[in-house]
Each structure stands twice: as structure tokens, then as C-alpha cells.
Amino acid sequence: MNIHAFDFDGTLTTRDTLIEFIRYACGTRAFLLGFLRHAPLLVLMKLHLYPNYRAKQRIFSHFFRGMSIDRFDALCANFARANRHLLRPGGLDALRSAINRGDTVVIVSASVDRWVIPFFTGIADTITSSQSLPFSTSLPSTSPRLTVIGTSVETSAGRLTGRFSTANCYGAEKVRRLLALYPDRANYHLTAYGDSRGDRELLALADKAHYKPFRH
């Protein structure tokens, strides 16, 4: 069995989709004001004095707490449709080639899974989330050709709480989540693709690792 595990932001895309999604969903003015408000926290994060996942949680909560999940999902789908140009052609070629060979493809991303999944509609025949998201019938739950492992959002009474329902899928959490889906490590060949510090553990786990691929 062959598994190809792709990081999303920076590996398959040319930009960080959290930043782009907030700008798309909230508008440039609200985006700039929100990040200005959190500037001290972001500086501390860059200096490794404040945890990445906490900064991400606070920023996400600032922009999306209280939004209906239906509206959020619609924004996710529309964002992906409007931003397919962010996907690197070489990454798409590698992903399609793996699928066409019958290999298993997994996207392992720190980004919110609800906006990652729609980027791949029309690229893979069937797409699933490791969290079994209640998306439309265009994302069947059986015989996945492509699975998305990402950070999931928490909801209450149909609205975003501003918190995440899973750990931030970053660093060692990427390995933990991948092995939870495919625990029999000795029985498959793993090829991994990543571009940042958050992918180190995933790349170290792989039989074959590609660091910062698809740049040419």
C-alpha cells in the first residue's frame, strides 16, 4: 500500500489560506483591524514566546465566533472556488498522479478542514474528512480517494463557538492523526510533502520525504 501525505498551506498552495480566508470572509478593513489588534500576540508567537495554536485560536475566535455553521460552510465553498489559483500546478500533478495509480492520498493540514476540502472537489472522485464532516453529497463518506486531516471547528446550536474541536493539526499532531487513520505503519510506504517547521515530524516519519517541492 502506498500513501501520499501532503501538507496544504505553502506546499500545495502559494499562500497561507487562513490569512486569505479571513480576508475573503470578513473584508480587508476588518481583516487589517483584527490583525492590528492581535499584533502584540503575533509578535510573541514569532518569538516563540506564545504558542502557535493559542494565537490561531484567539484570531479565529475574534473573526468567526457566533457565525452560523451554514454561513461558514458557504463561505468555505465559495472561497475555494474563487481561489483555486492558489494551488501549485506541480502539486496538483503529483496529487492526481497518485490518485490515478490507485494510491491513497491524504491532505494533512493545520488549516480548518471545512475550507480545505472544497479545494479538491472535481480533482478527486470522492473526498472525506477524518472528522466525517456533514458536507454536501459531493463529498461521499465511502471509498475515499482523498482524505483531509485538518483542524476542526466546534459548534453549539448551529453556531461557531470560536474554539476548535480538535487539537491544532501541526507538528507532532500531524503524525498522531495520520497514524490514527493508518496505524499499521510497517505495511505501507509513506511519501510525505511539506515546507515548514510544522511538517518536520511528518517528513521524519516518511519513507520518502519532499521538502519545499513544487516550486518550479
Where are these regions (language model features)?
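Conserved alpha/beta cores of soluble small-molecule-handling proteins
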Residues: 2, 28-31, 47-49, 70, ...
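Active-site neighborhood of HAD-like aspartate-dependent phosphohydrolases
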Residues: 1-48
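Helix-loop "lid/cap" segments that line or gate small-molecule binding pockets
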Residues: 43-48, 55-64
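A general alpha-helix detector
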Residues: 20-21, 55-59, 75
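Acidic catalytic patch
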Residues: 65-74
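Alpha-helix C-capping/helix-to-loop hinge sites
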Residues: 24, 28, 78-83
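Electropositive phosphate-/nucleotide-binding environments in soluble metabolic enzymes
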Residues: 12-15, 50, 66, 172-175
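C-terminal cap/substrate-recognition subdomain and adjoining C-terminal extension
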Residues: 74-75, 81-135, 139-216
